[in-house]
């Protein structure tokens, strides 16, 4: 096409001609009908598409993930509007890899294709991060679900609300915990997650150990430590292990249990009448055959809903700052146009929501212009910035003892549908020696670590080899101190203006070292403290696990087990030196990450600095970024408190990318909460906030 202002695209099926602007999409087809004179226009108009397949919606939702599936369901139920939901993937409702809880672990995979859904492009976008200099240049793939349910379709379905504190302290007005708790309750009753009631000796031993540590921390008088919960006072918030004990609820309605230890997580799994289990996730909760037929058309009172699968969204079409349509590409590579009457809601996740906005002309004008985006709508360099995630430093522990005793101690650790591999363990606060704990941590209990226990060796294969740890060993288990207030921020940028299937550029640098300058030491320490925050957190997480294991050695013996526990990854000797160094150097222990600046040339000082240096290797190679990405289009930066994209009339973002701060644990409950809140914001009435808890979607397993 030569005319840069306005061209004609001729539809070969209908023999009609429609305006088409090359300032929007570079796309053309043969012209079987006569050219019609065209007056130049600066306004983008409909691209070439098959008019037989044209759709028009009042609300067009982009992405059927945790938020988008819920949003489409309830908008269709509580309004007479025409709702169109576009999803790049499939439904997978009859795919046992998705629906069977054990399918997650490869039950149905061919032996030579034993990959998880998160590693399989049939189920997820394979978003490789740009080289991470803080992790030796690694480029990890961070899973992003592609199909009905989004990432809820491919993950372990650990449902965690996150506690009151993160919302009351890190989220803006209108999004405090009391504002959102009913929406969390809505998600919980809709999913109806299960808890594993299988007793595991190791879990009971660990809970008894954590209770002892909590009692010691309370007695110490320290204002902050990892098992202190201000909301429960001088009572350890640790589940008891007596036969009549009541399980503690990490997802309590009032959000009191920001710090709590428990025997089992909540898993998005339901038991069927025949005794079998099915994974319960956003897709089969809100879009099942009770509500949407096999052709994607809504049923009964959901007849206003249309779900289009295999629809990769290219961009939103604007007239001025008002969205008038959405372009998507079907599985055959044909471009389609959906007309928008009221508004567009983007629910494509933390990676793809900002990329759709950027391709649509919302973002940093300087950068977007440089890569060829022509139709610039609103200049906001913050779109795609502020990306946050959780990070999981992993430890491996060996159980020593007679084989029969080790087997007895580790019994009931196997993955099953109700635990999905996790055997508890705790939501923890800040370590007392973390220099980066919030200023009000003396009065408010923050959730900092999610402690999880699972069987086997949970580190990458190359680390197993280098450490001499065999995955077939039957005397090893994994403890993970997931850093759920991980300090680094990343950002996302599109690489091209017109290839929606391209993975965007994902920049996230994890563990940065601090290089001293010539400035006085007292001026450098505040900068070093923030720069080293990720490493500080990781090593303190190791110390928390070490303290737990040392206490477990005692409680295991008290429970009649003739075993002993030794951390083997990281090496026990290094963790022992770290623990002793924390006691020796106190609040300034972390200064020894920068030995030239601390100026301690004593043998003990040099050894501790060397210990920190060696331990820094482990979180860089034996840990991973979770698939908990969010905050890349957050409230106050890209969207306002009503989730409307700043600078537009009628576009919202209603997924985890809009989060003001990462939730305290696994993220899909928070993504769903945002979608639920968006229903009421769009409809202008608290339908979901006030919906009775017994009014829930009905599961259809056919």
Curated annotation (Swiss-Prot):
Annotated Gene Ontology cellular component terms: host cell membrane; membrane; virion component
Asked whether the keyword Transmembrane is assigned, the reply is yes
Q: Which residues bind FAD?
A: 58-88
Signal peptide start and end residues = none
As recorded in UniProt, its EC number(s) are 1.-.-.-
- What does the record give as the active site? 628
What cofactors does the UniProt entry give for this protein?
FAD
State the source organism's domain of life: Viruses
Membrane topology is: Single-pass membrane protein
List the keywords (alphabetical): FAD, Flavoprotein, Host membrane, Membrane, Oxidoreductase, Transmembrane, Transmembrane helix, Virion
Q: What molecular function does GO assign, one term?
A: flavin adenine dinucleotide binding
Enzyme class, top EC level, equals: oxidoreductase
Answer whether the UniProt record assigns the keyword Membrane to this protein. yes
Compartments, record wording: Virion; Host membrane
Its transmembrane ranges are 55-75
Protein family (similarity comment): Belongs to the GMC oxidoreductase family.
Q: Report what the protein is called.
A: Putative GMC-type oxidoreductase R135
